[in-house]
Amino acid sequence: MFLVIGAILAGALFVGLLLYQLKFKRLIDLISYMPGPPVLPLVGHGHHFIGKPPHEMVKKIFEFMETYSKDQVLKVWLGPELNVLMGNPKDVEVVLGTLRFNDKAGEYKALEPWLKEGLLVSRGRKWHKRRKIITPAFHFKILDQFVDVFEKGSRDLLRNMEQDRLKHGDSGFSLYDWINLCTMDTICETAMGVSINAQSNADSEYVQAVKTISMVLHKRMFNILYRFDLTYMLTPLARAEKKALNVLHQFTEKIIVQRREELIREGSSQESSKDDADVGAKRKMAFLDILLQSTVDERPLSNLDIREEVDTFMFEGHDTTSSALMFFFYNIATHPEAQKKCFEEIRSVVGNDKSTPVSYELLNQLHYVDLCVKETLRMYPSVPLLGRKVLEDCEINGKLIPAGTNIGISPLYLGRREELFSEPNSFKPERFDVVTTAEKLNPYAYIPFSAGPRNCIGQKFAMLEIKAIVANVLRHYEVDFVGDSSEPPVLIAELILRTKDPLMFKVRERVY
């Protein structure tokens, strides 16, 4: 009996391995034309990344592209997993500009325990319908109301910066921690309509849970040892993730239930206008309110549906904005002439009274600040790598790409290509001035918010928040970099772009 069972299992294993080998051989044959570094059996190119510090991975990918790629296309094997890296805007346009490659790469699965099937990771019909109902949440009338939240959050940030200025003086301090708490405050209030007061209560259970999940995601997505569920679930990291997820999901669920009950009592669900242009015009609304009043196929969204999107909004609008702001302050601190122009523009638009609140109209007049933000995102895109999954054999500009391939596109790499941007390692905000510049920019060379149908739905929200915080900080302080400005920061291209070492700043009060 046991011999029969053993023989059946052995036979099944043999057949499985045979089928896998045939499939793998087919993949190798189909992709044999594509250049790539020398490969090792079983691990592929994994030995270049396993056990290496994160900042070394960025250098290695750039080195591979410069050394081995042909027409800016390169294959990289991570074990049996085929990855194709693309750095030609013509290829990028095909991948991002159509719905043929609408599915995210396998690395995004690490996000599913928190975001479930939210807009970032959903696909097909569900993605299309969710995108349609969420788009009105970023109408200018609603963004106008969100500026009040940005104003409040940035004022709290100023108080914390003043404390650190008095405490540390010329020795400097890291802006990132305060900026990160500021963006957490603003994203919570705009997403759910509640204040978590992260800047005054950084040790709260919710704030710590967000930090834990951010740490887990970075490790899972870019550490091969954590990528396999069977081994990952046995680690302390998995237990920390489970605990943090319980906190986050329970918090969001509680807010959803409370707000749904309030809307029922108010009768808002029946009275609100269905016209996109009127959404949010009558009353200040959070992202959550819009979801609670939305329907898909004439049915209201469930609490789980709403939680997926609120959590996605929280994730996408928190660390990304913090990263952009940190690199913005680094750029203007190391380019005093740009900082001076930003300050003069802010002062001329907002006025001499530092207590004057910023507004939607005023922020849209900050033209030079806008150029500096765009140039910062070219040099230091918050999301350094985008991924798509190929579901069936296809051709991209004559290049055969097999089903199952992960396509990797790096906004960081594209933004540093000399063929696409003159002096790519120099901070030149004027390159984005469509009025004065002679430099023609390829729309698929500059993709800090991705591009095409799956581009970042909240990019206008992000730009407004960044400019609101910048306007208030620069009205009050002159920002100086504490460090060697002749050496660029060492980058870590994880889920969100970071630096190997904290960027340190000192601030001086502006008197005028």
UniProtKB/Swiss-Prot annotation:
Database matches in Pfam families: p450
Membrane topology: Peripheral membrane protein
Compartments in which it is found: Endoplasmic reticulum membrane; Microsome membrane
Gene Ontology cellular-component terms listed: endoplasmic reticulum membrane
Keyword Transcription regulation: no
Keywords associated with the record: Endoplasmic reticulum, Heme, Iron, Membrane, Metal-binding, Microsome, Monooxygenase, Oxidoreductase
Cofactor: heme
Record-linked InterPro entries: Cyt_P450 (IPR001128), Cyt_P450_CS (IPR017972), Cyt_P450_E_grp-I (IPR002401), Cyt_P450_sf (IPR036396), Cytochrome_P450_Monoox (IPR050196)
Entry keyword annotation includes Signal: no
Residues that hold heme according to the record: 316, 456
Gene3D superfamilies: Cytochrome P450
A Gene Ontology molecular function term of the record: iron ion binding
Listed EC numbers: 1.14.-.-
Function: Involved in the metabolism of insect hormones and in the breakdown of synthetic insecticides.
Family: Belongs to the cytochrome P450 family.
Protein name per the record: Cytochrome P450 4d1
Organism encoding this protein: Drosophila simulans
